[in-house]
Amino acid sequence: LLPLRTDGVALEVDVQLPDQLTYPIFDLNVLLGNLLDNAIEATALVTPKENQKITLKMKERFGALQLQVGNRFNSNIVPKNGTHKSDKINHGLGLKSVQEIVRRHHGKMWIVPEKDWFEINIILYDSNPEKLQGSGKSI
């Protein structure tokens, strides 16, 4: 994420995780990698450059992992093939991977698109029901 800061993108990060995570690190890497890659791609097209912004919020509460990635986007630009990426063949595989991880962890995913802001929210649930009491509060 450091290159984003040096490139002038406003970056807000709020990550509050325990030392011992109850979720596989591989799954977290896939989630963050794909969601941030999509946010970076969309934000790069925003003009003027001063309006470029990405947010990342992540915390674990009562055994549920809450993740939110938001970014500004240019709502006027809709690419012909649904992507600006050069690898159009593999386009969409990242989001499918994210959806599979959400399904595997009995989670929920919802997207909030607004005029110039896009936000994706994910909650993954731990299999330990005792930890889930009181969950459901948003980030």
Give the predicted meaning of each segment:
Residues 40-48:
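A short, flexible helix-to-loop-to-beta junction within the catalytic ATP-binding CA
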Residues 63-92, 131-138:
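Glycine-rich/acidic phosphate-handling loop/turn and adjacent ATP-lid/helix
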